[in-house]
């Protein structure tokens, strides 16, 4: 049997499917997620239910968002899960997660995310950060390094700034390729993202922050002066106390927020 077949389902490359099969890793992830009935528990991409089963067994109801119609059909017919699951067939990138929130209950979101959509999905989920208690995701190890990076490092970029603006970022564990069927060509890791209840650096317009960081990091090797000259002058950088000769990866999240707020105030 092909190593791309697991429990009778053939992994689909276009959906980025790699199914988690290592029970030790599964148990550690479920422990980190800490399922409970006080939150709306939401899984993105349940796949073949490696995380779905142990989480659903610990709670009354689990909401899942799955794109693959074949996998949705399997979940709908699953002997022990079908009565516990609230299944939404569709694309998580387009999904309105706010519809899942109940009065007095925030979401806990988790999933073994398809690596080909993990970054845009993060940006989509940040839009619902105020309604989320925490998130636990299996990601490409490189993405976890980017999420948790410090200024001045190669991994630090637009994703870092936006993630750390919205959330505390904590790597949980590293997962080798052999923990999956089929094994991915890259190492994986689990990360915990905890949205701030009160943001350390409030931004007046998050869209402006997103635009400014995208513009700054479009050309990483150039200076802020070069990349942001249409938005902030040398005199204005001086007013902000930011060295315009620095490169984008040398600027802290707090400084990016200060620049975005400055641009908003100028408009």
From Swiss-Prot:
It catalyses: adenosine(1518)/adenosine(1519) in 16S rRNA + 4 S-adenosyl-L-methionine = N(6)-dimethyladenosine(1518)/N(6)-dimethyladenosine(1519) in 16S rRNA + 4 S-adenosyl-L-homocysteine + 4 H(+). InterPro entries: KsgA/Erm, rRNA_Ade_diMease-like_C, rRNA_Ade_Mease_Trfase_CS, rRNA_Ade_methylase_Trfase_N, rRNA_adenine_dimethylase, SAM-dependent_MTases_sf. Pfam families: RrnaAD. Its EC number is 2.1.1.182. Its main location: cytoplasm. One of its GO terms (molecular function) is RNA binding. It comes from the Bacteria. Keywords: Cytoplasm, Methyltransferase, RNA-binding, rRNA processing, S-adenosyl-L-methionine, Transferase. SUPFAM superfamilies: S-adenosyl-L-methionine-dependent methyltransferases. S-adenosyl-L-methionine binds at residues 18, 20, 45, 66, 91, 112. It is found in: Cytoplasm. GO terms for cellular component: cytosol. Transmembrane segments: none annotated. Specifically dimethylates two adjacent adenosines (A1518 and A1519) in the loop of a conserved hairpin near the 3'-end of 16S rRNA in the 30S particle. May play a critical role in biogenesis of 30S subunits. Belongs to the class I-like SAM-binding methyltransferase superfamily. rRNA adenine N(6)-methyltransferase family. RsmA subfamily. This is Ribosomal RNA small subunit methyltransferase A. It comes from Shewanella woodyi (strain ATCC 51908 / MS32). The lineage of its organism: Bacteria, Pseudomonadati, Pseudomonadota, Gammaproteobacteria, Alteromonadales.
